[in-house]
Amino acid sequence: MSEIAQDSNVSIFSKNEKKARELILKLGLKPIQGVSRVTFKKKDGQIFAIDRPEVYKSQGGNFVVFGEAKVDDFTQRLAKAQESLQQNEGVLPAGQDAVSKDPQSIQADMQAAADSATDKPSADDAVDDAEVDETGLNADDIELVMQQAGVPRAKAAKALKEHDSDIVNAIMALSG
């Protein structure tokens, strides 16, 4: 009998669970990878949490979740987080202030930052004003890049020229 490595992830299923998994696959449910935690909140505020769940998605967009559901005591987790914060209160990275803000002021700060970013014209915006030579480019390709990347015609034409009329690379360059 071979040994199983200590850090390997091995699951042993019962006969009934194995049958249930086969039925899930027959129903066309697709497994979703990368889900580390699922929480369900009831109307009365009670929270159920499933750590390391197995999540499947149906063709209709519904999700099926398998795992051990536990009642999540949010107040206890919050108390632990506050306790650890108080222990580390004196230790802040350089240049940061311990300021508590309400949600409205945080949103106002975010809006101000977004407004200041849009007020500054960038070098790319100068391209919008200038005419770009569209010779050798297909008008349908330019329209497609404009639509997919959400950019003006001049930017789309410039990106297509830079990428030798490669639509995919032009869209990726403008989107990224």
From Swiss-Prot:
<dbReference type="InterPro" id="IPR002715">
    <property type="entry name" value="Nas_poly-pep-assoc_cplx_dom"/>
</dbReference>
<feature type="region of interest" description="Disordered">
    <location>
        <begin position="85"/>
        <end position="127"/>
    </location>
</feature>
<keyword id="KW-0539">Nucleus</keyword>
<comment type="subunit">
    <text>Part of the nascent polypeptide-associated complex (NAC), consisting of EGD2 and EGD1. NAC associates with ribosomes via EGD1.</text>
</comment>
<comment type="similarity">
    <text>Belongs to the NAC-alpha family.</text>
</comment>
<dbReference type="GO" id="GO:0015031">
    <property type="term" value="P:protein transport"/>
</dbReference>
<dbReference type="Pfam" id="PF19026">
    <property type="entry name" value="UBA_HYPK"/>
</dbReference>
<feature type="domain" description="UBA">
    <location>
        <begin position="137"/>
        <end position="176"/>
    </location>
</feature>
<dbReference type="InterPro" id="IPR044034">
    <property type="entry name" value="NAC-like_UBA"/>
</dbReference>
<protein>
    <recommendedName>
        <fullName>Nascent polypeptide-associated complex subunit alpha</fullName>
    </recommendedName>
</protein>
<dbReference type="Pfam" id="PF01849">
    <property type="entry name" value="NAC"/>
</dbReference>
<keyword id="KW-0813">Transport</keyword>
<comment type="function">
    <text>Component of the nascent polypeptide-associated complex (NAC), a dynamic component of the ribosomal exit tunnel, protecting the emerging polypeptides from interaction with other cytoplasmic proteins to ensure appropriate nascent protein targeting. The NAC complex also promotes mitochondrial protein import by enhancing productive ribosome interactions with the outer mitochondrial membrane and blocks the inappropriate interaction of ribosomes translating non-secretory nascent polypeptides with translocation sites in the membrane of the endoplasmic reticulum.</text>
</comment>
<keyword id="KW-0653">Protein transport</keyword>
<dbReference type="GO" id="GO:0005634">
    <property type="term" value="C:nucleus"/>
</dbReference>
<feature type="domain" description="NAC-A/B">
    <location>
        <begin position="14"/>
        <end position="78"/>
    </location>
</feature>
<dbReference type="InterPro" id="IPR016641">
    <property type="entry name" value="EGD2/NACA0like"/>
</dbReference>
<keyword id="KW-0963">Cytoplasm</keyword>
<dbReference type="GO" id="GO:0005854">
    <property type="term" value="C:nascent polypeptide-associated complex"/>
</dbReference>
<dbReference type="InterPro" id="IPR038187">
    <property type="entry name" value="NAC_A/B_dom_sf"/>
</dbReference>
